[in-house]
From Swiss-Prot:
GO terms for cellular component: cytosol. This is Ribosomal protein uS12 methylthiotransferase RimO. [4Fe-4S] cluster 1 binds at residues 26, 62, 91. The lineage of its organism: Bacteria, Pseudomonadati, Pseudomonadota, Gammaproteobacteria, Cellvibrionales. It comes from Cellvibrio japonicus (strain Ueda107). GO terms for molecular function: 4 iron, 4 sulfur cluster binding; aspartic acid methylthiotransferase activity; metal ion binding; protein methylthiotransferase activity.
Length: 451
Protein backbone atom coordinates (compact mmCIF):
# COMPACT_ATOMS: atom_id res chain seq x y z
CA UNK A 1 0.00 0.00 0.00
CA UNK A 2 1.49 3.32 -1.06
CA UNK A 3 1.04 6.04 1.54
CA UNK A 4 2.75 9.31 2.41
CA UNK A 5 2.77 8.39 6.06
CA UNK A 6 2.24 4.80 7.08
CA UNK A 7 1.23 5.16 10.71
CA UNK A 8 0.99 8.80 11.82
CA UNK A 9 -0.56 8.06 15.22
CA UNK A 10 -2.14 4.70 15.91
CA UNK A 11 -4.49 4.70 18.88
CA UNK A 12 -4.09 2.24 21.70
CA UNK A 13 -7.77 1.37 21.31
CA UNK A 14 -8.41 -1.73 19.20
CA UNK A 15 -12.16 -1.03 18.88
CA UNK A 16 -11.75 2.10 16.79
CA UNK A 17 -12.50 1.85 13.03
CA UNK A 18 -9.43 1.81 10.81
CA UNK A 19 -8.57 3.90 7.73
CA UNK A 20 -5.90 3.31 5.11
CA UNK A 21 -4.74 6.43 3.29
CA UNK A 22 -3.02 6.95 -0.07
CA UNK A 23 -1.76 10.48 -0.78
CA UNK A 24 -0.64 11.35 -4.31
CA UNK A 25 0.51 14.52 -6.03
CA UNK A 26 2.06 17.79 -4.92
CA UNK A 27 2.85 19.20 -1.46
CA UNK A 28 -0.45 21.11 -1.53
CA UNK A 29 -2.27 17.79 -1.78
CA UNK A 30 -0.08 16.44 1.02
CA UNK A 31 -1.29 19.25 3.29
CA UNK A 32 -4.88 18.35 2.44
CA UNK A 33 -4.12 14.74 3.42
CA UNK A 34 -2.62 15.89 6.71
CA UNK A 35 -5.72 17.92 7.51
CA UNK A 36 -8.08 15.01 6.76
CA UNK A 37 -5.94 12.58 8.78
CA UNK A 38 -5.80 14.98 11.72
CA UNK A 39 -9.58 15.27 11.86
CA UNK A 40 -10.03 11.51 11.53
CA UNK A 41 -7.63 10.89 14.41
CA UNK A 42 -9.44 13.48 16.53
CA UNK A 43 -12.63 11.49 15.94
CA UNK A 44 -10.96 8.26 17.02
CA UNK A 45 -10.22 6.58 13.70
CA UNK A 46 -7.00 4.56 13.56
CA UNK A 47 -4.73 5.19 10.57
CA UNK A 48 -3.13 1.93 9.41
CA UNK A 49 -0.37 1.16 6.89
CA UNK A 50 -1.87 -1.82 5.05
CA UNK A 51 -4.96 -2.61 3.03
CA UNK A 52 -5.64 -5.75 5.07
CA UNK A 53 -5.83 -3.84 8.36
CA UNK A 54 -8.08 -1.08 6.99
CA UNK A 55 -11.87 -1.01 7.21
CA UNK A 56 -11.81 1.56 4.41
CA UNK A 57 -9.24 3.28 2.17
CA UNK A 58 -9.17 6.96 1.17
CA UNK A 59 -7.24 7.87 -2.00
CA UNK A 60 -6.29 11.55 -2.32
CA UNK A 61 -5.70 11.93 -6.04
CA UNK A 62 -3.80 14.19 -8.44
CA UNK A 63 -5.19 15.15 -11.84
CA UNK A 64 -2.83 17.88 -13.05
CA UNK A 65 -1.45 16.05 -16.10
CA UNK A 66 -2.49 12.87 -17.88
CA UNK A 67 0.25 10.76 -16.30
CA UNK A 68 -0.96 11.86 -12.86
CA UNK A 69 -4.52 10.91 -13.82
CA UNK A 70 -3.37 7.43 -14.81
CA UNK A 71 -1.37 7.06 -11.58
CA UNK A 72 -4.42 8.09 -9.56
CA UNK A 73 -6.74 5.71 -11.42
CA UNK A 74 -4.20 2.95 -10.86
CA UNK A 75 -4.03 3.69 -7.13
CA UNK A 76 -7.83 3.61 -6.88
CA UNK A 77 -7.88 0.27 -8.70
CA UNK A 78 -5.22 -1.19 -6.43
CA UNK A 79 -7.12 -0.08 -3.33
CA UNK A 80 -10.34 -1.60 -4.68
CA UNK A 81 -8.62 -4.89 -5.48
CA UNK A 82 -6.84 -5.12 -2.13
CA UNK A 83 -9.54 -3.71 0.15
CA UNK A 84 -12.80 -3.13 -1.71
CA UNK A 85 -14.07 -0.10 0.23
CA UNK A 86 -12.64 3.08 -1.27
CA UNK A 87 -13.41 6.80 -1.03
CA UNK A 88 -11.82 9.12 -3.59
CA UNK A 89 -10.92 12.77 -3.02
CA UNK A 90 -8.48 15.31 -4.45
CA UNK A 91 -8.04 17.04 -7.80
CA UNK A 92 -9.17 14.10 -9.94
CA UNK A 93 -12.46 14.21 -8.05
CA UNK A 94 -13.40 17.11 -10.33
CA UNK A 95 -13.64 14.50 -13.11
CA UNK A 96 -16.17 12.30 -11.35
CA UNK A 97 -17.54 10.72 -14.52
CA UNK A 98 -14.05 9.67 -15.61
CA UNK A 99 -13.45 7.92 -12.29
CA UNK A 100 -16.82 6.17 -12.30
CA UNK A 101 -16.30 4.99 -15.86
CA UNK A 102 -13.15 3.14 -14.80
CA UNK A 103 -14.07 2.33 -11.20
CA UNK A 104 -17.87 2.27 -10.75
CA UNK A 105 -17.63 0.57 -7.34
CA UNK A 106 -16.01 3.38 -5.35
CA UNK A 107 -18.06 4.40 -2.31
CA UNK A 108 -17.90 8.12 -3.00
CA UNK A 109 -16.01 10.92 -4.75
CA UNK A 110 -15.21 14.47 -3.61
CA UNK A 111 -13.08 17.23 -5.11
CA UNK A 112 -9.94 18.94 -3.85
CA UNK A 113 -9.81 20.39 -0.31
CA UNK A 114 -13.38 19.16 0.36
CA UNK A 115 -12.57 18.25 3.95
CA UNK A 116 -16.10 18.31 5.35
CA UNK A 117 -17.44 16.25 2.45
CA UNK A 118 -14.74 13.62 2.93
CA UNK A 119 -15.51 13.34 6.63
CA UNK A 120 -19.25 13.16 5.96
CA UNK A 121 -18.71 10.27 3.56
CA UNK A 122 -16.46 8.48 6.05
CA UNK A 123 -19.15 8.88 8.72
CA UNK A 124 -21.77 7.49 6.32
CA UNK A 125 -19.84 4.38 5.35
CA UNK A 126 -17.77 3.85 8.51
CA UNK A 127 -19.26 5.58 11.58
CA UNK A 128 -16.83 6.54 14.37
CA UNK A 129 -16.63 4.43 17.48
CA UNK A 130 -19.12 5.32 20.22
CA UNK A 131 -16.44 4.46 22.79
CA UNK A 132 -13.85 6.89 21.41
CA UNK A 133 -11.95 8.54 24.26
CA UNK A 134 -10.30 11.83 23.21
CA UNK A 135 -7.97 11.64 26.21
CA UNK A 136 -6.38 8.38 25.03
CA UNK A 137 -6.53 9.13 21.29
CA UNK A 138 -4.49 12.31 21.60
CA UNK A 139 -3.49 14.37 18.55
CA UNK A 140 -0.51 16.76 18.81
CA UNK A 141 -1.25 20.52 18.60
CA UNK A 142 0.37 20.74 15.17
CA UNK A 143 -1.84 17.92 13.85
CA UNK A 144 -0.78 14.82 11.92
CA UNK A 145 2.20 15.49 9.65
CA UNK A 146 3.37 13.31 6.77
CA UNK A 147 6.73 15.05 6.43
CA UNK A 148 9.74 14.42 8.68
CA UNK A 149 9.45 16.18 12.02
CA UNK A 150 11.93 18.91 11.17
CA UNK A 151 10.20 20.46 8.16
CA UNK A 152 6.61 21.18 7.19
CA UNK A 153 4.61 22.63 4.33
CA UNK A 154 2.61 25.74 5.24
CA UNK A 155 -0.27 26.21 2.81
CA UNK A 156 -1.44 29.82 2.73
CA UNK A 157 -4.22 29.70 0.14
CA UNK A 158 -6.32 27.53 -2.13
CA UNK A 159 -7.03 27.91 -5.82
CA UNK A 160 -5.70 30.25 -8.49
CA UNK A 161 -6.95 33.32 -10.39
CA UNK A 162 -4.75 32.79 -13.44
CA UNK A 163 -5.88 31.27 -16.71
CA UNK A 164 -2.69 29.71 -18.08
CA UNK A 165 -3.70 27.93 -21.26
CA UNK A 166 -1.90 24.68 -20.39
CA UNK A 167 -3.34 24.36 -16.88
CA UNK A 168 -6.65 23.17 -15.42
CA UNK A 169 -5.88 23.82 -11.75
CA UNK A 170 -8.52 26.62 -11.43
CA UNK A 171 -11.12 24.15 -12.74
CA UNK A 172 -10.07 21.59 -10.13
CA UNK A 173 -9.28 23.77 -7.13
CA UNK A 174 -11.29 26.90 -7.85
CA UNK A 175 -10.41 30.58 -7.62
CA UNK A 176 -7.95 32.02 -5.10
CA UNK A 177 -9.05 31.78 -1.47
CA UNK A 178 -6.44 33.14 0.96
CA UNK A 179 -6.23 32.02 4.57
CA UNK A 180 -6.27 34.86 7.15
CA UNK A 181 -2.70 35.78 8.01
CA UNK A 182 -3.37 35.40 11.75
CA UNK A 183 -4.51 31.82 11.17
CA UNK A 184 -1.43 31.05 9.05
CA UNK A 185 0.90 32.52 11.67
CA UNK A 186 -0.83 30.57 14.43
CA UNK A 187 -0.22 27.33 12.53
CA UNK A 188 3.39 28.32 11.89
CA UNK A 189 3.95 28.95 15.60
CA UNK A 190 2.51 25.55 16.52
CA UNK A 191 4.78 23.85 14.00
CA UNK A 192 7.88 25.62 15.32
CA UNK A 193 6.98 24.72 18.92
CA UNK A 194 6.68 21.10 17.77
CA UNK A 195 10.27 21.11 16.51
CA UNK A 196 9.95 22.17 12.87
CA UNK A 197 13.17 23.82 11.64
CA UNK A 198 12.01 24.72 8.12
CA UNK A 199 8.69 26.12 6.89
CA UNK A 200 7.99 25.69 3.18
CA UNK A 201 5.38 28.26 2.13
CA UNK A 202 3.15 26.81 -0.59
CA UNK A 203 0.02 27.67 -2.59
CA UNK A 204 -0.92 27.76 -6.25
CA UNK A 205 0.39 31.34 -6.36
CA UNK A 206 2.19 32.55 -3.25
CA UNK A 207 2.71 36.08 -4.60
CA UNK A 208 -1.07 36.55 -5.00
CA UNK A 209 -1.65 35.91 -1.31
CA UNK A 210 -4.41 38.19 -0.02
CA UNK A 211 -5.50 39.59 -3.40
CA UNK A 212 -8.94 37.97 -3.12
CA UNK A 213 -9.64 39.65 0.24
CA UNK A 214 -8.04 42.98 -0.76
CA UNK A 215 -5.12 42.35 1.63
CA UNK A 216 -7.41 42.56 4.63
CA UNK A 217 -5.78 43.39 7.97
CA UNK A 218 -5.75 40.58 10.52
CA UNK A 219 -4.03 40.20 13.89
CA UNK A 220 -1.20 38.04 15.15
CA UNK A 221 0.53 38.32 18.51
CA UNK A 222 -1.58 41.38 19.32
CA UNK A 223 -0.53 43.43 16.31
CA UNK A 224 -2.11 44.15 12.93
CA UNK A 225 -0.77 42.47 9.79
CA UNK A 226 -1.91 42.89 6.21
CA UNK A 227 -2.69 39.66 4.39
CA UNK A 228 0.03 39.85 1.75
CA UNK A 229 3.21 37.99 0.85
CA UNK A 230 5.63 40.59 2.22
CA UNK A 231 4.06 40.91 5.68
CA UNK A 232 3.65 37.13 5.90
CA UNK A 233 7.28 36.52 4.97
CA UNK A 234 8.46 39.19 7.42
CA UNK A 235 6.38 37.72 10.26
CA UNK A 236 7.50 34.16 9.53
CA UNK A 237 11.07 35.46 9.56
CA UNK A 238 10.62 36.35 13.24
CA UNK A 239 10.08 32.70 14.26
CA UNK A 240 13.76 31.78 14.09
CA UNK A 241 13.48 28.96 11.52
CA UNK A 242 14.22 28.56 7.84
CA UNK A 243 11.46 30.06 5.66
CA UNK A 244 11.36 28.99 2.00
CA UNK A 245 9.04 30.57 -0.60
CA UNK A 246 7.58 28.32 -3.31
CA UNK A 247 5.31 28.85 -6.33
CA UNK A 248 5.94 32.57 -6.72
CA UNK A 249 4.43 34.24 -9.78
CA UNK A 250 6.76 36.95 -11.19
CA UNK A 251 4.73 39.98 -10.07
CA UNK A 252 6.66 43.26 -9.58
CA UNK A 253 5.96 43.24 -5.82
CA UNK A 254 8.09 40.09 -5.47
CA UNK A 255 10.98 42.57 -5.44
CA UNK A 256 9.84 43.63 -1.96
CA UNK A 257 10.79 40.32 -0.32
CA UNK A 258 14.39 40.41 -1.58
CA UNK A 259 15.54 42.72 1.27
CA UNK A 260 14.15 40.17 3.76
CA UNK A 261 16.52 37.65 2.21
CA UNK A 262 19.41 40.10 2.42
CA UNK A 263 18.60 40.54 6.14
CA UNK A 264 18.57 36.77 6.72
CA UNK A 265 14.89 36.67 7.71
CA UNK A 266 13.88 34.48 4.76
CA UNK A 267 16.04 31.94 2.92
CA UNK A 268 17.69 33.38 -0.20
CA UNK A 269 15.65 31.09 -2.43
CA UNK A 270 12.86 31.79 -4.91
CA UNK A 271 10.83 29.22 -6.81
CA UNK A 272 9.39 31.04 -9.85
CA UNK A 273 7.96 29.01 -12.75
CA UNK A 274 8.84 31.14 -15.79
CA UNK A 275 7.63 28.40 -18.23
CA UNK A 276 9.28 29.91 -21.34
CA UNK A 277 11.24 32.92 -22.59
CA UNK A 278 9.73 33.56 -26.02
CA UNK A 279 7.21 36.44 -25.80
CA UNK A 280 5.19 34.77 -28.55
CA UNK A 281 4.96 31.48 -26.66
CA UNK A 282 4.29 33.22 -23.35
CA UNK A 283 1.31 35.01 -24.87
CA UNK A 284 -0.03 31.67 -26.09
CA UNK A 285 0.51 30.27 -22.61
CA UNK A 286 -1.20 33.35 -21.11
CA UNK A 287 1.88 34.05 -19.00
CA UNK A 288 3.81 37.30 -18.34
CA UNK A 289 5.93 38.04 -21.40
CA UNK A 290 8.33 40.86 -20.47
CA UNK A 291 11.50 38.78 -20.68
CA UNK A 292 13.97 41.68 -20.72
CA UNK A 293 12.43 43.10 -17.55
CA UNK A 294 12.62 39.65 -15.96
CA UNK A 295 16.34 39.42 -16.70
CA UNK A 296 16.88 42.92 -15.30
CA UNK A 297 15.02 42.00 -12.14
CA UNK A 298 17.09 38.83 -11.70
CA UNK A 299 20.22 40.96 -12.02
CA UNK A 300 18.93 43.40 -9.39
CA UNK A 301 17.95 40.58 -7.03
CA UNK A 302 21.44 39.10 -7.21
CA UNK A 303 23.05 42.48 -6.61
CA UNK A 304 21.11 42.66 -3.34
CA UNK A 305 21.50 38.97 -2.46
CA UNK A 306 24.59 37.50 -4.15
CA UNK A 307 23.90 33.99 -2.83
CA UNK A 308 20.29 33.94 -4.08
CA UNK A 309 19.16 30.56 -5.45
CA UNK A 310 16.62 30.69 -8.25
CA UNK A 311 14.54 27.64 -9.16
CA UNK A 312 12.20 27.53 -12.13
CA UNK A 313 10.29 25.22 -14.46
CA UNK A 314 9.87 25.38 -18.23
CA UNK A 315 7.83 23.71 -20.95
CA UNK A 316 9.34 22.74 -24.31
CA UNK A 317 7.35 21.66 -27.34
CA UNK A 318 4.34 23.87 -26.60
CA UNK A 319 2.00 24.18 -29.63
CA UNK A 320 3.45 26.61 -32.15
CA UNK A 321 6.97 26.59 -30.65
CA UNK A 322 9.41 27.27 -33.48
CA UNK A 323 13.14 26.72 -33.52
CA UNK A 324 13.53 30.48 -33.08
CA UNK A 325 11.31 30.39 -29.98
CA UNK A 326 13.37 27.55 -28.56
CA UNK A 327 16.63 29.40 -29.25
CA UNK A 328 15.21 32.36 -27.30
CA UNK A 329 14.64 29.99 -24.39
CA UNK A 330 18.22 28.71 -24.52
CA UNK A 331 19.48 32.29 -24.67
CA UNK A 332 17.43 33.13 -21.58
CA UNK A 333 18.98 30.19 -19.70
CA UNK A 334 22.48 31.38 -20.60
CA UNK A 335 21.79 34.91 -19.42
CA UNK A 336 19.66 34.15 -16.35
CA UNK A 337 22.05 31.49 -14.98
CA UNK A 338 19.32 29.84 -12.91
CA UNK A 339 20.44 27.44 -10.21
CA UNK A 340 17.73 24.77 -10.24
CA UNK A 341 15.53 24.03 -13.23
CA UNK A 342 12.87 21.50 -14.13
CA UNK A 343 11.77 20.95 -17.71
CA UNK A 344 8.70 19.22 -19.11
CA UNK A 345 7.77 18.20 -22.61
CA UNK A 346 4.35 19.61 -23.39
CA UNK A 347 1.53 17.09 -23.40
CA UNK A 348 -2.17 17.92 -23.79
CA UNK A 349 -4.20 18.02 -20.59
CA UNK A 350 -7.89 17.26 -20.92
CA UNK A 351 -9.86 20.48 -20.56
CA UNK A 352 -6.92 22.87 -21.13
CA UNK A 353 -7.31 25.78 -23.56
CA UNK A 354 -3.93 24.97 -25.12
CA UNK A 355 -5.50 21.90 -26.71
CA UNK A 356 -7.22 24.21 -29.19
CA UNK A 357 -3.96 25.80 -30.40
CA UNK A 358 -2.68 24.97 -33.89
CA UNK A 359 0.76 23.68 -34.94
CA UNK A 360 1.49 20.88 -32.47
CA UNK A 361 5.17 20.01 -32.15
CA UNK A 362 6.24 16.51 -33.19
CA UNK A 363 7.24 14.18 -30.36
CA UNK A 364 10.75 13.64 -31.75
CA UNK A 365 11.29 17.41 -31.89
CA UNK A 366 10.04 17.79 -28.31
CA UNK A 367 12.49 15.13 -27.17
CA UNK A 368 15.39 16.69 -29.05
CA UNK A 369 14.66 20.13 -27.59
CA UNK A 370 14.27 18.67 -24.11
CA UNK A 371 17.67 16.98 -24.44
CA UNK A 372 19.33 20.19 -25.63
CA UNK A 373 17.65 22.18 -22.85
CA UNK A 374 18.77 19.77 -20.13
CA UNK A 375 22.31 19.54 -21.50
CA UNK A 376 22.67 23.32 -21.32
CA UNK A 377 21.07 23.64 -17.89
CA UNK A 378 23.17 20.82 -16.43
CA UNK A 379 26.29 22.71 -17.50
CA UNK A 380 24.97 25.90 -15.89
CA UNK A 381 23.95 24.10 -12.68
CA UNK A 382 27.33 22.35 -12.51
CA UNK A 383 29.18 25.65 -12.83
CA UNK A 384 27.05 27.37 -10.22
CA UNK A 385 27.44 24.54 -7.71
CA UNK A 386 31.20 24.50 -8.31
CA UNK A 387 31.29 28.07 -6.99
CA UNK A 388 30.22 26.75 -3.59
CA UNK A 389 33.29 24.53 -3.21
CA UNK A 390 35.41 25.97 -0.40
CA UNK A 391 32.47 27.74 1.22
CA UNK A 392 31.05 26.84 4.62
CA UNK A 393 27.27 26.45 4.49
CA UNK A 394 24.62 25.77 7.12
CA UNK A 395 23.05 22.38 6.37
CA UNK A 396 19.79 20.95 7.72
CA UNK A 397 20.21 17.20 8.27
CA UNK A 398 17.46 15.03 6.74
CA UNK A 399 18.81 11.48 7.10
CA UNK A 400 21.56 9.59 8.90
CA UNK A 401 22.61 5.99 8.24
CA UNK A 402 25.73 3.85 8.60
CA UNK A 403 27.40 5.58 5.65
CA UNK A 404 26.91 9.12 6.89
CA UNK A 405 24.44 11.98 6.82
CA UNK A 406 22.42 13.63 4.07
CA UNK A 407 21.18 17.18 4.39
CA UNK A 408 20.21 20.29 2.49
CA UNK A 409 21.58 23.80 2.32
CA UNK A 410 19.50 26.97 1.93
CA UNK A 411 19.68 26.29 -1.83
CA UNK A 412 17.88 22.93 -1.64
CA UNK A 413 14.18 22.31 -1.14
CA UNK A 414 13.22 18.75 -0.15
CA UNK A 415 12.35 16.27 -2.91
CA UNK A 416 12.99 18.60 -5.86
CA UNK A 417 16.53 19.96 -5.40
CA UNK A 418 19.92 18.51 -4.56
CA UNK A 419 21.49 17.30 -1.32
CA UNK A 420 24.62 17.83 0.74
CA UNK A 421 26.38 14.57 1.63
CA UNK A 422 28.46 14.24 4.80
CA UNK A 423 30.20 10.93 4.15
CA UNK A 424 31.08 8.98 7.27
CA UNK A 425 29.51 11.52 9.65
CA UNK A 426 27.07 9.72 11.95
CA UNK A 427 27.38 12.08 14.94
CA UNK A 428 24.42 14.18 13.81
CA UNK A 429 20.68 13.55 13.75
CA UNK A 430 17.77 14.60 11.53
CA UNK A 431 16.74 18.16 12.29
CA UNK A 432 20.23 19.33 13.27
CA UNK A 433 21.56 22.41 11.49
CA UNK A 434 25.34 22.14 11.17
CA UNK A 435 28.06 24.06 9.36
CA UNK A 436 29.61 22.12 6.49
CA UNK A 437 32.69 22.99 4.47
CA UNK A 438 31.98 22.09 0.85
CA UNK A 439 34.71 20.01 -0.78
CA UNK A 440 33.16 18.62 -3.97
CA UNK A 441 30.22 19.17 -6.31
CA UNK A 442 28.52 17.78 -9.41
CA UNK A 443 25.54 19.01 -11.45
CA UNK A 444 23.05 18.45 -8.62
CA UNK A 445 24.69 17.76 -5.26
CA UNK A 446 27.43 18.83 -2.85
CA UNK A 447 29.79 16.88 -0.58
CA UNK A 448 31.50 18.23 2.50
CA UNK A 449 32.73 17.87 6.07
CA UNK A 450 31.18 19.26 9.23
CA UNK A 451 33.25 22.01 10.85
Amino acid sequence: MTTSGCNPMKSSSTSNPTIGFVSLGCPKNLVDSERILTQLRMEGYNIVPSYNDADMVIVNTCGFIDSAVQESLGAIGEALNENGKVLVTGCLGAKKDEIIQVHPNVLGITGAHAYEEVLAQVHEHLPPSQTHNPFTDLVPPQGIKLTPRHYAYLKISEGCNHSCSFCIIPDMRGKLVSRPIGQVMGEAERLVKAGVKELLVISQDTSAYGVDIKHRTDFWDGRPLKTDMYQLAAALGELGVWVRLHYVYPYPHVDNVIPLMAQGKVLPYLDIPFQHASPTLLRKMRRPGQVEKTLERIKNWREQVPNLTLRSTFIVGFPGETEADFEELLGFLEEAQLDRVGCFQYSPVEGAKANELPDPVLDEIKQARYDRFMQLQQRISTERLKQKVGQTLPVLIDEVDDEGAIGRSYADAPEIDGCVYLNGDIQVKPGDIVNVQIEHSDEYDLWGTRV
